[in-house]
Curated annotation (Swiss-Prot):
Name the UniProt record assigns to this protein: 6,7-dimethyl-8-ribityllumazine synthase
CDD domains: Lumazine_synthase-I
Catalytic activity of the protein: (2S)-2-hydroxy-3-oxobutyl phosphate + 5-amino-6-(D-ribitylamino)uracil = 6,7-dimethyl-8-(1-D-ribityl)lumazine + phosphate + 2 H2O + H(+)
Record-linked NCBIfam families: lumazine-synth (TIGR00114), PRK00061.1-4 (NF000812)
Organism this protein belongs to: Aquifex aeolicus (strain VF5)
Self-association state and partner proteins as the record states: Forms an icosahedral capsid composed of 60 subunits, arranged as a dodecamer of pentamers.
């Protein structure tokens, strides 16, 4: 039996990060976490392309452009959505997650989900580097593992 698992080394890999500017104080912490994860796992900052977009709605289209680049091994999507009083949150959260999943399947390239979807500001803060870890770091770790897995499967 052959078993494939992605290695947790970023050495020699190139990553794209697409990050929204909306809720930038929290998004910046997620971006810092993602970059820290890549570097701690042997990657280099010069092998990371960071693209800033206005909000989470724009993340999938920019992620698709990055993922189409042959020199990018994986894309990390980063944003923060906080529920408000209207259904806007539900529409954005649903479409962003579906858009990223569909792109990853269509392009056959890892696109990981580092978009916090929180009911409250407190929940978002907890997931941006405090009580519940840093979701940017976690998304980067998944990107490292999946990029290596794809390389071994091809």
């Amino acid at each position: 039996m052959q078993i494939y698992e992605g290695k947790l080394t970023a050495e020699g890999l190139r990553f794209g990060i697409v990050a929204s500017r909306f809720n930038h104080a929290l998004v910046d912490r997620l971006v810092e976490g993602a970059i820290d994860c890549i570097v701690r796992h042997g990657g280099r900052e010069e092998d990371i392309t960071l693209v800033r977009v206005p909000g989470s709605w724009e993340i999938p289209v920019a992620a698709g452009e990055l993922a189409r680049k042959e020199d990018i091994d994986a894309v990390i999507a980063i944003g923060v959505l906080i529920r408000g009083a209207t259904p806007h949150f539900d529409y954005i959260a649903s479409e962003v997650s579906k858009g990223l999943a569909n792109l990853s399947l269509e392009l056959r390239k890892p696109i990981t989900f580092g978009v916090i979807t929180a009911d409250t500001l407190e929940q978002a803060i907890e997931r941006a580097g405090t009580k519940h870890g840093n979701k940017g770091w976690e998304a980067a770790l998944s990107a490292i593992e999946m990029a290596n897995l794809f390389k071994s499967l091809r």
